[in-house]
């Protein structure tokens, strides 16, 4: 195929053999041919550019559609779905669809997802801290439970010992009043016999001042509290067991 340079060389060789008019016609024909070839090439490139622009527009529409917040992806990031999270302990960003539709900065679902992921990471830190606090509280409760269990076992042992002592002494077969007296004695209450006039001038209970004309001894209950205060109650026939029991419990 003859190139442009070859054609020019050929023209130069024929300059002397042809007249000027023929030479001009050949040059014009050559220029026209080059122009047509160039125009065809430009049309081809213009067509390619148009096709690429259409592809760009289509791709942008697809990207915008992906970024757009629809019903499905909005529900995925909606904070109202996180029912296990207390709103008081952790605050999520509330993505409002109506407001996001008017704002380009919040109308990108991927930006919203990234923001929600950051919030979830922060929530994970909060949950780990709360779990640590719960484990600490649980360990403290277990420690208190063990102490209470040991105390309960100690009380049960003392109660079993008391019941065994009562059973060995035959107290269980005695009168209920005697059982109460033995119980009071085990609680540190002293039961003594004393003449009625022994406490007539003392500072005991008013019932201790009750007079008795005979010189026989009466049963007395001497109650000592934690402050070593002594209270004396004369056990008289007119006093019921209920009164005596309540009196003793009040003084303990």
UniProtKB/Swiss-Prot annotation:
Protein's cellular compartments: Nucleus; Chromosome, Centromere, Kinetochore
InterPro entries: Ndc80_Spc24, Spc24_Fungi_globular_sf
Composition skew (Low complexity), residue ranges: 206-217
Gene Ontology biological process: cell division; chromosome segregation; sister chromatid biorientation
A Pfam cross-reference name: Spc24
Any coiled-coil regions, as ranges: 41-71, 115-170
Keywords: Cell cycle, Cell division, Centromere, Chromosome, Coiled coil, Kinetochore, Mitosis, Nucleus
SUPFAM superfamilies cross-referenced by the UniProt entry: Kinetochore globular domain
Function statement: Acts as a component of the essential kinetochore-associated NDC80 complex, which is required for chromosome segregation and spindle checkpoint activity.
Assembly information from the UniProt record: Component of the NDC80 complex, which consists of NDC80, NUF2, SPC24 and SPC25.
Protein name according to UniProt: Probable kinetochore protein SPC24
Record lineage: Eukaryota, Fungi, Dikarya, Ascomycota, Saccharomycotina
């Amino acid at each position: 195929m003859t190139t442009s340079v070859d054609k020019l060389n050929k023209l130069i060789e024929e300059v002397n053999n042809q007249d000027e008019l023929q030479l001009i016609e050949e040059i014009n024909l050559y220029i026209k041919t080059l122009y047509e070839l160039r125009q065809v090439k430009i049309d081809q490139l213009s067509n390619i550019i148009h096709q690429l622009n259409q592809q760009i527009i289509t791709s942008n529409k697809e990207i915008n559609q992906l970024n757009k917040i629809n019903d499905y992806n909005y529900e995925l990031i909606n904070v109202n779905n996180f029912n296990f999270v207390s709103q008081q302990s952790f605050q999520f960003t509330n993505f409002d669809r109506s407001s996001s539709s008017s704002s380009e900065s919040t109308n990108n679902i991927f930006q919203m997802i990234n923001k929600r992921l950051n919030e979830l990471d922060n929530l994970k830190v909060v949950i780990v801290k709360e779990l640590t606090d719960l484990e600490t509280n649980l360990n403290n409760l277990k420690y208190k439970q063990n102490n209470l269990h040991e105390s309960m076992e100690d009380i049960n042992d003392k109660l079993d010992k008391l019941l065994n002592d009562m059973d060995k002494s035959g107290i269980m077969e005695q009168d209920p009043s005697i059982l109460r007296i033995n119980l009071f004695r085990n609680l540190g209450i002293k039961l003594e016999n004393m003449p009625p006039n022994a406490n007539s001038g003392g500072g005991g209970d008013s019932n201790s001042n009750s007079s008795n004309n005979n010189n026989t001894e009466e049963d007395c209950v001497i109650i000592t509290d934690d402050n070593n205060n002594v209270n004396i109650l004369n056990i008289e026939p007119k006093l019921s067991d209920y009164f005596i029991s309540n009196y003793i419990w009040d003084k303990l």
